[in-house]
């Protein structure tokens, strides 16, 4: 299978590694530093303490270099949420009649952003649960279990056969479930990531601390209940059972887990704050639902996010 991975952060490198290890032709679009590092060594993937050196991955800094290949069978969009619309325009020439586009972003808007450019017939909604941290430009560590994906078409116009895509992902040790209602699935993940990630950033603590401190665990649950109320007001079929389920997922995370938004804020990089707690606020205001916990998260973290987006203050 021909796979294009657009974005070489932790999640992008993880999927590149496991798919290449399973024998698929993988091309990664990353920054020049990634291209340089890839020319010097194999991609290093660390899982459960084991280190694998994965070879055979093509790495380019300019997607135009990948356009000489046939259209991709699968395009994985692994950039940050605010970069998705630009990514859609960039990958459009590689989308053929049977190409599947799989966004891995946190939040609830990425699939629609892609579909607006590429057409909903190519785009899957996807909830991705994996803790993958890029430790060097060409090295990634997976904390905890291999990735779990819950996927589904975002419209009835989706026209691509899924069997081969699902099989390829499973061959790469990626757990895949087909969602009966991808909108509910995306909101469940949104409930999880915006709440534990937001409180983690607010407290500057990992899951091992926030899950075992009764006050922060309760705050995370209350933040999830805010997302529940917003989603229900938008017609999403969520219930308190979803809160219980997402809290169970949270408590099962590796104690060292932090969200990517939390890490970005701590390390002075632009974050997905606008697409997590910021989105909870936007969607809540649209239907008159108050979200005070997510407001506190957003307001307290916004100065750091603004500073990270100023070229003179951005971390290298």
Question: What residue spans do the PLM features occupy?
Answer:
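Short, well-ordered alpha-helices that flank and scaffold nucleotide-derived cofactor binding pockets
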Residues: 17, 21, 89-93, 116, ...
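NAD(P)-dependent Rossmann-like dehydrogenase/reductase catalytic/cofactor-binding core
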Residues: 221-316
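Residues at the C-termini of beta-strands that transition into short coil/loop
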Residues: 30, 49, 61-64, 105, ...
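Rossmann-like NAD(P)(H) cofactor-binding subdomain of soluble oxidoreductases
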Residues: 52-139
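Internal alpha-helical scaffold of NAD(P)-dependent oxidoreductase catalytic cores
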Residues: 37, 93-94, 117-124, 137-241
């Amino acid at each position: 299978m021909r796979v294009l991975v657009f974005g070489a952060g932790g999640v992008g490198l993880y999927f590149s590694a496991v798919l290449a290890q399973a024998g698929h032709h993988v091309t990664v679009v990353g920054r020049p530093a990634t291209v340089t590092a890839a020319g010097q060594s194999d991609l290093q993937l660390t899982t459960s303490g084991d280190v694998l050196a994965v070879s055979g991955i093509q790495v380019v800094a300019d997607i135009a270099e990948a356009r000489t290949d046939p259209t991709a069978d699968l395009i994985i969009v692994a950039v940050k949420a605010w970069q998705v619309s630009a990514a859609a325009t960039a990958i459009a020439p590689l989308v053929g009649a049977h190409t599947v586009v799989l966004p891995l972003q946190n939040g609830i808007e990425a699939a629609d952003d892609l579909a607006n450019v590429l057409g909903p017939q190519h785009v899957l909604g996807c909830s991705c649960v994996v803790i993958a941290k890029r430790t060097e430009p060409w090295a990634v560590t997976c904390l905890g279990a291999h990735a779990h994906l819950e996927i589904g078409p975002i419209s009835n116009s989706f026209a691509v056969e899924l069997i081969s895509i699902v099989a390829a992902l499973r061959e790469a040790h990626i757990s895949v479930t087909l969602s009966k209602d991808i909108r509910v699935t995306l909101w469940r993940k949104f409930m999880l990531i915006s709440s534990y990630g937001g409180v983690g950033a607010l407290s500057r603590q990992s899951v091992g601390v926030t899950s075992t401190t009764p006050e922060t665990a309760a705050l995370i649950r209350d933040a999830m209940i805010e997302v529940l109320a917003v989603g229900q007001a938008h017609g999403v079929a969520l219930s308190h059972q979803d809160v219980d389920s997402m809290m169970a997922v949270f408590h099962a995370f590796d104690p060292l887990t932090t969200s990517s938004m939390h890490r970005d804020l701590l390390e002075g990089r632009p974050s997905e704050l606008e697409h997590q707690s910021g989105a909870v606020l936007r969607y809540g205001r649209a239907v008159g639902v108050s979200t005070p916990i997510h407001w506190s998260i957003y307001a307290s973290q916004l100065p750091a996010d603004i500073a990270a987006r100023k070229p003179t203050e951005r971390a290298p």
